[in-house]
Swiss-Prot record:
F-type ATPases have 2 components, F(1) - the catalytic core - and F(0) - the membrane proton channel. F(1) has five subunits: alpha(3), beta(3), gamma(1), delta(1), epsilon(1). F(0) has four main subunits: a(1), b(1), b'(1) and c(10-14). The alpha and beta chains form an alternating ring which encloses part of the gamma chain. F(1) is attached to F(0) by a central stalk formed by the gamma and epsilon chains, while a peripheral stalk is formed by the delta, b and b' chains. It is a single-pass membrane protein. This is ATP synthase subunit b', chloroplastic. One of its GO terms (cellular component) is chloroplast thylakoid membrane. The chain crosses the membrane at residues 24-44. It is found in: Plastid, Chloroplast thylakoid membrane. Pfam families: ATP-synt_B.
Length: 156
């Protein structure tokens, strides 16, 4: 295009308007401006706007997909947390039930052992009492016989 400094220096001031005289140049510049705008719109702006619009649609579609995946991930997370919580509660109940069963088994075994020990002690003590009684009876007979022997020896 024409350099502005050359245009200003080559213009001569003749008449009342000088450089800013309204003659055929202003409509010519306006027509050039409109032609330039139409050309730029056809050549540059339309393809650029279509590319921008395609990019916008691409970003929006991927954003929607990402939002859907995020929602699915949140749903799965809550579902897995609920499953984990129920599994944890079931495990705690299983542990508590197992502990109660083992405690009952231990109590039963302890009772059986205690009864066995009591019966064994009863048997041993009755055996000892019987042996003591027989020993005392035999000692009594021995003492009686010894006493009679001593009496017979003393009376001689």
């Amino acid at each position: 295009m024409i350099n502005l400094s050359i245009l200003i220096s080559s213009s001569e001031v003749s008449g009342p308007g000088g450089l800013f005289d309204i003659n055929a140049t202003l409509p010519l510049v306006a027509i050039q401006f409109i032609l330039l705008m139409v050309t730029l719109n056809i050549i540059l702006y339309s393809p650029l706007l279509t590319i921008i619009e395609e990019r916008k649609e691409y970003v929006l579609s991927h954003l929607a997909q990402a939002s859907e995946k995020l929602a699915q991930a949140k749903e799965l997370t809550t579902q897995y947390e609920q499953d984990l919580e129920t599994a944890r509660k079931e495990a705690q109940l299983e542990i508590a039930n197992s502990q109660n069963i083992h405690k009952e088994i231990l109590d039963i075994e302890l009772d059986i052992s205690q009864k066995y020990i009591d019966n064994l002690l009863e048997t041993i003590s009755s055996d000892l009492l019987n042996k003591k009684k027989t020993a005392l009876d035999s000692l009594d007979t021995i003492v009686t016989s010894l006493c009679t022997e001593v009496e017979t020896k003393l009376s001689i």
